[in-house]
């Protein structure tokens, strides 16, 4: 069937990337919040955009996270910046979580949301200004991609370059240790394996309720 509406382009026949309040560049994943707002990881522009209903073709976003405004797309390692964001999810309290792949971390943003706001918490790194590329640890991430919450509020993070999925349990805190690892025998291994227990460059994760 044909799509009924398009975001990121003025019409169904355009395909150009743009750094504007209505443009997108390499969008990866989307999620709806409890109010029906649509959130998009605009990966090529290093940002997350919120679109509020009613939706319309080529409409402008209402809010941007990861950049100070709608025309910037720079890369940085701060509490308010993103570098190649991919996974996106909301927890049961309405907090927004973003997998910041290029910075090797997952960020939590608490409402009320605002343009260019700072994150409240970071997983995968010791602070908001550090990017550590090191062997796997219980708290480290290397190119996190997909993220999802289960019905108990546990956060699953696909740790792509470490060939594993980590489970973090609430209550969450900066640089906390994961409670569980899937795809590896322990928290210090990163072996690629085509077995019932192994993983190799995983990208996405889901939860069954």
Describe each region flagged by the PLM.
Residues 1-28, 54-86, 112-145, 171-209:
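Gly/Pro-rich loop segments of beta-rich domains
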Residues 46-48, 104-106, 163-166:
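Structural signal for beta-propeller blades
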Residues 43-44, 53, 101-102, 111, ...:
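Short loop/turn segments immediately following the C-termini of beta-strands
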Residues 32-35, 90-93, 149-152, 209:
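Residue-level detector of Asp-centered blade-edge/turn motifs that repeat once per structural unit
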Residues 37-39, 95-97, 154-156:
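Conserved beta-propeller blade signature
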Residues 42, 91, 100, 150, ...:
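Acidic active-site catalytic centers that drive phospho-/nucleotidyl reactions
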Residues 22, 80, 94, 148, ...:
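Active-site helical microenvironments for divalent-metal-assisted chemistry
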């Amino acid at each position: 069937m044909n799509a009924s509406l398009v975001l990121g382009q003025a019409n169904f026949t355009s395909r150009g990337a743009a750094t504007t309040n209505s443009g997108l560049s390499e969008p990866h994943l989307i999620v709806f919040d409890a109010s029906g707002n649509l959130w998009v990881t605009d990966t090529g522009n290093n940002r997350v955009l919120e679109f509020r209903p009613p939706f319309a073709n080529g409409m402008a976003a209402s809010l941007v996270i990861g950049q100070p405004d709608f025309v910037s797309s720079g890369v940085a390692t701060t509490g308010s910046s993103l570098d190649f964001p991919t996974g996106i999810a909301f927890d049961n309290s309405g907090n927004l979580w973003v997998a910041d792949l290029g910075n090797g971390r997952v960020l939590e943003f608490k409402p009320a949301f605002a343009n260019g706001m700072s994150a409240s918490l970071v997983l995968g790194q010791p602070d908001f200004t550090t990017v550590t590329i090191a062997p796997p640890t219980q708290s480290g991430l290397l190119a996190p991609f997909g993220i999802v919450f289960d019905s108990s509020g546990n956060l699953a993070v696909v740790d792509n370059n470490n060939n594993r999925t980590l489970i973090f349990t609430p209550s969450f805190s900066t640089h906390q240790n994961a409670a569980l690892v899937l795809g590896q025998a322990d928290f210090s291994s990163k072996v690629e394996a085509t077995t019932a227990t192994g993983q190799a460059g995983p990208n996405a994760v889901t939860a069954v309720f």
